[in-house]
Amino acid sequence: MNINLTLIGQAIAFAFFVAFCMKFVWPPLINAISERQRKIADGLNAAEKAKADLADAQAQVKQELDAAKAQAAQLIEQANRRAAQLIEEARTQAAAEGERIRQQAKEAVDQEINSAREELRQQVAALAVTGAEKILNQQVDAEAHNAMLSQLAAKL
């Protein structure tokens, strides 16, 4: 294989081409590749940060959800206690009202009994006076009669 002038010319042209590429083509390509690597690295870092933020947010949501559940359970328990208290108060009031009604009924019955006794005493007294008049066949003094009847009624 002979080295001739064409081969030397091609070698010089290739050297100029390599120098031209290293001077004008290679730096923008390296800069573009470096910029792309930086953007990819920034994107990966942002993704990692977002993943960490998501994990923190999920933990916070779980914590707040647990707190809300606990608060809801506490409110339900408090409502149940209040309902039981209201039921007990209603029972107490109903018992007191029943006792009051029973007492009023007892007083009304006692009053009716006393009224009936008084009426019966008056009827017995009137019958006694009528019987005494028939036996004695004379009119008894009304004031003396009333006094005797009052004493008799007091004894009954």
UniProtKB/Swiss-Prot annotation:
Cited CDD domains: ATP-synt_Fo_b
KW Lyase (keyword) present: no
Main location: membrane
A GO term for molecular function: proton-transporting ATP synthase activity, rotational mechanism
Membrane topology: Single-pass membrane protein
Keyword Cell membrane attributed: yes
TM region positions: 5-25
Subunit structure: F-type ATPases have 2 components, F(1) - the catalytic core - and F(0) - the membrane proton channel. F(1) has five subunits: alpha(3), beta(3), gamma(1), delta(1), epsilon(1). F(0) has three main subunits: a(1), b(2) and c(10-14). The alpha and beta chains form an alternating ring which encloses part of the gamma chain. F(1) is attached to F(0) by a central stalk formed by the gamma and epsilon chains, while a peripheral stalk is formed by the delta and b chains.
NCBIfam families in alphabetical order: ATP_synt_b, PRK05759.1-2
Stated role: F(1)F(0) ATP synthase produces ATP from ADP in the presence of a proton or sodium gradient. F-type ATPases consist of two structural domains, F(1) containing the extramembraneous catalytic core and F(0) containing the membrane proton channel, linked together by a central stalk and a peripheral stalk. During catalysis, ATP synthesis in the catalytic domain of F(1) is coupled via a rotary mechanism of the central stalk subunits to proton translocation. Component of the F(0) channel, it forms part of the peripheral stalk, linking F(1) to F(0).
Protein known as: ATP synthase subunit b
Organism: Acinetobacter baumannii (strain ATCC 17978 / DSM 105126 / CIP 53.77 / LMG 1025 / NCDC KC755 / 5377)
Lineage: Bacteria, Pseudomonadati, Pseudomonadota, Gammaproteobacteria, Moraxellales
